[in-house]
Every structure is written in C-alpha cells, then in structure tokens.
From Swiss-Prot:
Taxonomic lineage: Bacteria, Bacillati, Bacillota, Clostridia, Thermoanaerobacterales
EC number: 1.5.1.5, 3.5.4.9
GO cellular component: cytosol
Coiled coil: none
Entries under CDD domains matching the protein: NAD_bind_m-THF_DH_Cyclohyd
Protein name from the UniProt record: Bifunctional protein FolD
Record GO biological process: L-histidine biosynthetic process; methionine biosynthetic process; purine nucleotide biosynthetic process; tetrahydrofolate interconversion
GO molecular function: methenyltetrahydrofolate cyclohydrolase activity; methylenetetrahydrofolate dehydrogenase (NADP+) activity
Family statement drawn from the similarity comment of this UniProt entry: Belongs to the tetrahydrofolate dehydrogenase/cyclohydrolase family.
Top-level taxon in the UniProt lineage: Bacteria
Amino acid sequence: MAERLTGKPVADAIKEELKGRVADLKAKGIVPKLGIVRVGARPDDLYYEGGAKKTCESIGMDYEVFEYPQDIDQESFEKAIIEIGAKKDIHGILMFSPLPKHLNERKIRSLIPVEKDVDSLTLGSAGKVFADDPTGFPPCTPTAVMEILKYYNIPLEGKRAVVLGRSLVVGKPAAILLLRENATVTICHSRTKNLPDVCREADILVAAVGRAKMVKEDYVKPGMVVIDVGINEDPDNPGKYCGDVDFDKVEPIVDKITPVPGGVGSVTTAVLCKHTVKACEILNGLV
C-alpha cells in the first residue's frame, strides 16, 4: 500500500510558521489582512470562505468579506474592486470565480492590484510567475502541490514530472513550479496521444483534469508519486467526493499518493494566508 501524503500536517506546519511572522508584523503595528470578494452565495465558495476565515483566525491574521448580489452590474462591481484594492489595510485579495456571465471577468480581474493578487488572478501575476519573479504569487492550488512535495521530502531535481491538465489555474503554473525545482516536465491534455503510456513515464504524476477517477492503474507504475488535485462528485458514491485518480485501483501500485478529500485541498487556505502575509511584508518594505 502506498504512503498517504495527507495535507493536514503540511497545513499545520505552514500555519505554525505564519504565526511567528504575523506576531513579528503585529509587533511593528502591522496586521496582515485578506479581502475576500464574493458575488452571490455558491455553496463551494462559502465552504472555501469558511476555511479561509478559520485559517486567518488561527494565525492571528485579519480578514474582511465583501459580498455582492448576483445581479450586480459591471460598473458597480468595477468600482467596488478598485475601492477594495486601494484600501491600505488590505494586503491580499481573493475573488471567487467564475463570476456571473453578465460580468466581464477578465476586465474585473485586471483591476486587482498585482501586489495584492495572492491567487494569481491577473495577467500581471501570471507574467511574474512565468518570469520567476519572487514578488509574484502563483495560484494557491499548485503552490499547495509544491508544499506537499517539499514537506514529505520528495526529490524533484532531475526527476520526470507529468502534469495531467493544462489549465491556467493548476496545470500550467504547476509545470512552471516543478521546472523551478529542476524537474523535467511534460504537460498532458485531451489531445495527448497514448496518454496512459506518457503518464507511466513519470516519477511524479500531478492529476488536474477535473474528471472523476480518470487515472486508472494503466496510468501508473511502482515507485511513482501521485498528487491528485481533482475534486469531483463521486459517480459511485452519491453525495461524496473523489479526485481525478481512481484511488482504490492506483494506491496498491504506487509509492506515495495524496487522498481526496484530505490532500491538496486541505493545504490551499494555508497557502492563501502565506501569500497574504508575504504580500503584507512586501507592501511594508520588510522583504
């Protein structure tokens, strides 16, 4: 049976480190603060928001929720985002997406100040991540993947990493972050030929396609590390969730694997707070 790379100890270690950094900031009269922007009240957004609030509270960080009705118009929402971005006491901004279809999301994202964009919503942040600029913040989910690999001392240099999925939110930034650690990276997608064969070449497989239990036993090999980013409704167990990996079939074969739930997702709010604390330090000229 594979070793389960659970997220809780990773998140706990991040939060423990952040408590000290927040205390240092408070000693200077600075309180890091996250602004959470939400339109409507989707259950998934409310669930993540609850986790973010809890994490902020656990490390002594502040937060403020900016909630808007589902039918808010473009002009009003743009004005609201500009006002939030200008607040000196807000150091990081999380905006839930997708926004309602009548809103121009690309335009609204562009109004978030890059230095407060702690989940890589803007093109400016994406550019910084691509250019390895240390002041840029990658999306929280692929950063959580890297935090897990680091915590469990999984070597990356010279290793073959396959990223299954090419989204701007996970796949592409995950590939960039793996490249930073000198892994040799392949990105796979729906048009990749002989997909299971390509995935089997990996030492580390990152599954981020958003398809329940897509990764079967023919995608993996003994000795592999599997990081499952997916969170999907389980087709075999109504009301429950599963990842992109068919856990029961893959776990007996591979060396290490993240569970769903309890894996990558449980680390993302800790990363969100870590990014916000760093943004606060940068904005106050402390790094």
